[in-house]
Amino acid sequence: MPLHALSGDPFDALGDPNRRAIVELLRTGDRSVSELAEELPISRPAVSRHLRLLKRAGLVADRAEGTRRLYRLDDEGIAAVREYLEDVWGEAPTRFRLLAENTSERTGRDAR
């Protein structure tokens, strides 16, 4: 799934330290809102709000288990972010080389 296919902006969603902490906690497995709230310095309603935003951004999915909901990382959304970053990072050495060449050309001209 390409990054633009996600309904929300995953980078905006990851801009908040509490949401990043939730993502880190979910890396270890499925958790309920209560389990997440026990690990974080925020209330259960705040955790729920953050999870809604992460879900809208395609980074988190949920499922019902009995009377509670369990949250997990959404593999497709995480893969889309990873693919995007790999594409951007893969171009970085070429861009750096071009920048270095342009800088040295300008420096050489300025020295004359």
Q: Could you say what each language-model-derived stretch is?
A:
Residues 24, 38, 49, 55-56:
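Alpha-helical residues within the helix-turn-helix
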Residues 12, 21-24, 55, 61, ...:
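A cross-family signal for key residues in well-ordered alpha-helices
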Residues 29, 46-48, 53:
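Short glycine/proline-centered loop/turn elements that form peptide/ligand docking sites
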Residues 2-43, 68-79:
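N-terminal helix-turn-helix DNA-binding core of bacterial DNA-binding proteins
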Residues 55-66, 72-73:
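Beta-hairpin "wing" of winged helix-turn-helix
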